[in-house]
């Protein structure tokens, strides 16, 4: 038995274990499956709270020091005078101590492994707690820390108990030797930096403390020491075997027996008992402390993310008299994971991974995850058609896997290893001195999590190059758990250490021939000689801010090429932290906002959801692209559609198809049809469509699939899929619009004034701009109607460019270098003409920078007898400048409309390369809802393919994109945080005839596909505008 050390704190610290890669722990207990130590089978079967497991979460005492050497020896037995109360779990940076640091690649400390700075912030935690005398007499008492960042020493009642590092896996210690009846005292010294920090260089906030649960666990003297269950299925998946191994510990285990029982809906499905002593292993014998049983199961209910059917497995340890000593339990899902014929399969079916990467992040609590937030994440993922999650880039809170088992998500469980900032990246992976530390991070993860059916892939870590240590760990995992594939992206995504080709940010059709680690196009990669593995992108579609363009292109490739089996979007949640400004107002902060250096600014804002889990518009794009139903318009007369189910295992029995036929948003007919579709089958539906009278407008068939009843992860009437088609309509000839009076032109010294009844337009003769429009005596413009060729840069436009590190290839730098953000108009022509039935104003502008013309814009404005302003605009773009972000017009309107209505794509923000989720229809939204509150302000709020826009007295018609905003493009460009934006008078109207895509294959290189770049050098557009 371990004997607690009487050494003083200073002597223990003098060894500097935190700078020795060969020391990852002292006296930490071996890894095993999670324990609860129930006293009876009924409680274990019901997963009730166990009386032998006691939470130590709550208020602890805390003292903060700049370095561990500053901590007085006396602290191990008594609190320091400056101690304050702090919650556990928490990150101390979120409690007002020290500084959170956000950095992506660059290490937050000087790179000199295994050494860390002498200034090493240190948190000293203490807690007094009570222990019942019966606990001490009846067995062993352990303490379990589920997560401490980055390393810690533990004392109990003044005696040193051990040391541990690896922030993301449990550390468990036996306290039995030093506990006493009544009051006891824990003291935990936590270091911000240790040599393990060189293995934890993930793209995230760097924070410290006891950030996961702490608990006391009581085990009887003889107890279950580990358990492992493996499901085996026959070729027809209608018979199964559950292979179970249990390990025991304690002096009397040889006299004991374990009963293993499989339960389903409260009933025993299979049971078996065995005494310890495995079969003969080798010439030296067997495992005396282990036992194995096999439970046969006929017609098992199979687990998948679609049908998360679970059984409950209990392990009851009894002594020689039949008394229960210890009970453990876990959920079991019968499923088989394999790679065959180049495809990743579950239960014999090739998967299409609809995945997302997820960091454990909470805006107020940092890296502390509560159950409600975990459940909310899963519910949102399921509602938006995700079926998989990658635990990027470390093992998650233990509860996460249980919830994934029960809700149904496929999981990639990833080891807490990333050395992205090393040069070369593989430096530690090829160093045998670091093998023990890397090994523990992989092996302990597998031993903790291997009973979870949701985990279908193990990952050796992230962005650590490729080295011999990876090859060794790959072999260990494959030997220890041959039931799951292993993936690892480092070294080029297709090394011998991965069963899956798992690149990050490879593009559909474009090669990226980087030296040493090329990224081939996806279509090319799967066709390369001797490459037979499935390809699943471990990261793709970088969702940073206003991004996610081209996502539909990936999904077209996934659906057309079976070995392209999907991928994991980067990433789930914006990693912003809540901070208060000088006035006490909360805002979401990113890198640098805490004075943290180094920092990577807003690069932590890559989420599909905001920090509070409000969706970004990109989330709806993912939902539509990934939907589990596909539709085909078979014929229009009769009106017939096919609905195909992409579900592999689930019979559709909770879905209803609801359809309507609408003309310009007005519903002409509607109906609903119950769906009963077997997996991967099709249901044909004939829709009773009425005869359409000739009338203005387009006719659209809209179909939605809704879940009629609530599920574990969605409310009733949740829409899970949709589609629409434009239907042929009778030819309609619109009658001519008859005006009541012709407009009148007056040529004045400074303006061309056009009048029509209660309206007047002023075209400034010096600038050529429409500077004012009076309607019923009210001025409606605050700023003139002007050409608009730029946008407030998106994150994807900026790329990695910074003030101190310019990337000349970034779109924004190319636009700046060309002078496109510094344009000055030169008027070449401004003339008016009175016609018999109308007035025309013709202008020609050269938009110049440094004396060079970049754009020529010719506008012909016509005001007709109905008082409608018609615009006809021709734009020429200089041949030697980069393609512009937009071609359109902008003005500041005097009114601030409450709402806006439009006929076009909506209701949510959409851009030319991100509009799969947008639907043709008539939409009405409040003005504020037309703005997307990205934390880092950029151009936002566009609605594409608009035919009609109405707000206040204004009505525009044509074929254009638009945005309405309280914020000018200049303010959006100049402001660093959304909370600093100030609403401007009136509102800004942007009318775009052409708008470049947002891109999103990645956010550090130009990624807008060629078809969404404004390649043409001559463009023309027209629209009409009237006021009532």
UniProtKB/Swiss-Prot annotation:
GO terms of molecular function: beta-galactosidase activity; carbohydrate binding; magnesium ion binding
Annotated transmembrane regions: none
Residue positions binding Na(+): 203, 603, 606
Pfam family, one: Glyco_hydro_2
BP-aspect Gene Ontology terms: lactose catabolic process
PROSITE patterns the record matches: GLYCOSYL_HYDROL_F2_1, GLYCOSYL_HYDROL_F2_2
Binding residues annotated for Mg(2+) 1, in chain numbering: 418, 420, 463
Enzyme Commission code: 3.2.1.23
GO cellular component, one term: beta-galactosidase complex
Annotated substrate binding sites: 104, 203, 463, 539-542, 606, 1004
Cofactor binding note: Binds 2 magnesium ions per monomer. Binds 1 sodium ion per monomer.
Catalytic-site annotation from UniProt: 463 (proton donor), 539 (nucleophile)
Site (Transition state stabilizer) location in chain: 359, 393
Enzyme class name: hydrolase
Cofactor(s) the record lists: Mg(2+); Na(+)
InterPro entries: B-gal_small/dom_5, Bact_Beta-galactosidase, Beta-gal/glucu_dom_sf, Gal_mutarotase_sf_dom, Galactose-bd-like_sf, GH-type_carb-bd, Glyco_hydro_2, Glyco_hydro_2_AS
PANTHER family: BETA-GALACTOSIDASE
Protein family: Belongs to the glycosyl hydrolase 2 family.
Subunit structure: Homotetramer.
Protein name: Beta-galactosidase
Species whose genome carries this gene: Enterobacter sp. (strain 638)
Species lineage: Bacteria, Pseudomonadati, Pseudomonadota, Gammaproteobacteria, Enterobacterales
Chain's gene name: lacZ
């Amino acid at each position: 038995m371990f004997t607690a050390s009487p050494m003083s704190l200073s002597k223990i610290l003098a060894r500097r274990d935190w700078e020795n890669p060969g020391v990852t722990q002292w006296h930490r207990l071996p890894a095993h499956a999670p324990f609860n130590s129930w006293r009876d089978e009924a409680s274990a079967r019901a997963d009730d709270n166990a009386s032998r497991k006691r939470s130590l979460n709550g208020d602890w005492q805390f003292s903060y020091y700049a370095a561990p050497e500053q901590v007085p020896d006396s602290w191990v037995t008594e609190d320091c005078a400056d101690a304050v109360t702090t919650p556990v779990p928490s990150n101390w940076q979120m409690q007002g101590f020290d500084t959170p640091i956000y950095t992506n690649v660059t290490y937050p400390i000087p790179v000199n492994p295994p050494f860390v700075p002498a200034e090493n912030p240190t948190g000293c935690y203490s807690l007094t707690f009570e222990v019942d005398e019966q606990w001490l007499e009846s067995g062993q008492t352990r303490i379990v820390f589920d997560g401490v960042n980055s390393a810690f020493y533990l004392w109990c009642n003044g005696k040193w108990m051990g040391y541990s590092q690896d922030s993301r896996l449990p550390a468990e210690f036996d306290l039995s030797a030093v506990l006493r009846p009544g009051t006891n005292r824990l003291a935990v010294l936590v270091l911000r930096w240790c040599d393990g920090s060189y293995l934890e260089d993930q793209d995230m906030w760097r924070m410290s403390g006891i950030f996961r649960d702490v608990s006391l666990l009581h085990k009887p003297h003889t107890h279950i020491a580990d358990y492992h269950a493996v499901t085996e299925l026959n070729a027809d998946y209608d018979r199964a075997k559950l292979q179970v191994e249990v390990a025991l510990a304690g002096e009397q285990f040889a006299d004991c027996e374990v009963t293993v029982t499989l339960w389903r809906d409260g009933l025993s499905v299979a049971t078996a008992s065995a005494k310890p002593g495995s079969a003969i292993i080798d010439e030296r014998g067997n495992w005396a402390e282990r036992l194995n049983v096999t439970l046969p199961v006929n017609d098992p209910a199979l687990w998948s993310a679609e049908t998360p059917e679970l059984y409950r497995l209990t392990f009851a340890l009894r002594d020689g008299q039949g008394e229960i000593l210890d009970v453990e339990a876990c959920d079991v899902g019968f499923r088989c994971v394999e790679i065959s014929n180049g495809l990743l399969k579950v239960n014999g079916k090739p998967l299409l991974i609809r995945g997302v990467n997820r960091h454990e992040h909470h805006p107020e609590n940092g890296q502390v995850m509560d159950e409600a937030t975990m459940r909310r994440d899963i519910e949102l993922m399921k509602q938006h058609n995700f079926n998989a999650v990658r635990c990027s880039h470390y093992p998650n809170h233990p509860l996460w896997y249980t919830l994934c088992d029960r809700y149904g998500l496929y999981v990639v469980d990833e080891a807490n290893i990333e050395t992205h900032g090393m040069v070369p990246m593989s430096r530690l992976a090829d160093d045998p001195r670091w093998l023990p530390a890397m090994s523990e991070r992989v092996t302990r993860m597998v031993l903790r999590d291997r009973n979870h059916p949701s985990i279908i892939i193990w990952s050796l870590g992230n962005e650590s190059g490729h080295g011999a240590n990876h090859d060794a760990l790959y072999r260990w995992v494959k030997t220890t758990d041959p039931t799951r594939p292993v993936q690892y992206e480092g070294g080029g995504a297709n090394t011998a250490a991965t069963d899956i080709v798992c690149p990050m940010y490879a593009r559909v059709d474009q090669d990226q021939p980087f030296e040493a680690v090329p990224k081939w196009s996806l279509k090319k990669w799967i066709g390369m000689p001797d490459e037979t593995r499935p390809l699943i992108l471990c990261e793709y579609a970088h969702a940073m801010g206003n991004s996610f363009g081209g996502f539909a292109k990936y999904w077209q490739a996934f659906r057309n090429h079976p070995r392209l089996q999907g991928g994991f979007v980067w990433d789930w949640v914006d990693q912003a932290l809540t901070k208060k400004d000088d006035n006490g107002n909360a805002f979401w902060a990113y890198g640098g906002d805490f004075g943290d250096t180094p920092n990577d600014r807003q690069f932590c804002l890559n989420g599909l959801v905001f920090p509070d889990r409000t969706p970004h518009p990109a989330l709806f794009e993912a939902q539509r692209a990934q939907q589990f139903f596909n539709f085909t318009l078979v014929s229009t007369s009769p009106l017939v559609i096919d609905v195909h189910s992409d579900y592999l295992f689930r019979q559709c029995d909770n879905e209803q198809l609801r359809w309507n036929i609408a003309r310009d948003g007005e519903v002409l007919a509607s109906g609903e049809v119950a769906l009963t579709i077997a997996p991967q089958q099709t249901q044909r539906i004939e829709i009773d469509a009425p005869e359409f009278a000739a009338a203005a407008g387009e006719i659209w068939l809209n179909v939605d699939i809704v879940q009629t009843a609530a599920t574990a992860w969605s409310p009733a009437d949740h829409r899970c899929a949709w589609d629409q088609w434009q239907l042929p309509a009778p030819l309609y000839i619109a009658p001519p619009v008859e005006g009541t009076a012709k407009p009148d032109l007056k040529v004045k010294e400074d303006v061309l004034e056009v009048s029509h009844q209660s309206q007047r337009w002023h075209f400034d003769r010096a600038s050529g701009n429409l500077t004012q429009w009076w309607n019923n005596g009210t001025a409606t413009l605050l700023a003139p109607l002007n050409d608009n060729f730029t946008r407030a840069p998106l994150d994807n436009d900026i790329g990695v460019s910074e003030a101190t590190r310019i990337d000349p290839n970034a779109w924004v730098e190319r636009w700046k270098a060309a002078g496109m953000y510094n344009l000055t108009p030169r008027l070449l022509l401004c003339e008016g003409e009175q016609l018999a039935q109308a007035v025309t104003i013709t202008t020609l502008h050269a938009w110049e920078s440094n004396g060079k013309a970049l754009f020529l814009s010719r506008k012909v404005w016509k005001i007709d007898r109905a008082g409608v302003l018609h615009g006809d605009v021709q734009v020429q773009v200089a041949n030697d400048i980069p393609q512009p972000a937009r071609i359109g017009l902008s003005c500041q309107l005097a009114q601030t409309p409450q709402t806006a209505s439009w006929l076009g794509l909506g209701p949510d923000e959409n851009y030319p390369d991100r509009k799969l989720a947008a639907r043709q229809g008539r939409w009405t939204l409040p003005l504020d809802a037309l703005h997307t509150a990205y934390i880092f302000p950029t151009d936002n709020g566009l609605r594409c393919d608009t035919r009609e826009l109405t707000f206040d007295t204004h009505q525009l018609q044509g074929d254009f994109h638009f945005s309405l905003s309280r914020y000018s493009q200049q303010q959006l460009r100049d402001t660093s945080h959304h909370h600093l934006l100030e609403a401007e008078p009136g509102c800004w109207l942007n009318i775009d005839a052409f708008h470049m895509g947002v891109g999103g294959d990645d956010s550090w290189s130009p990624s807008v596909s060629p078809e969404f770049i404004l390649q043409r050098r001559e463009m023309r557009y027209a629209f009409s505008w009237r006021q009532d």
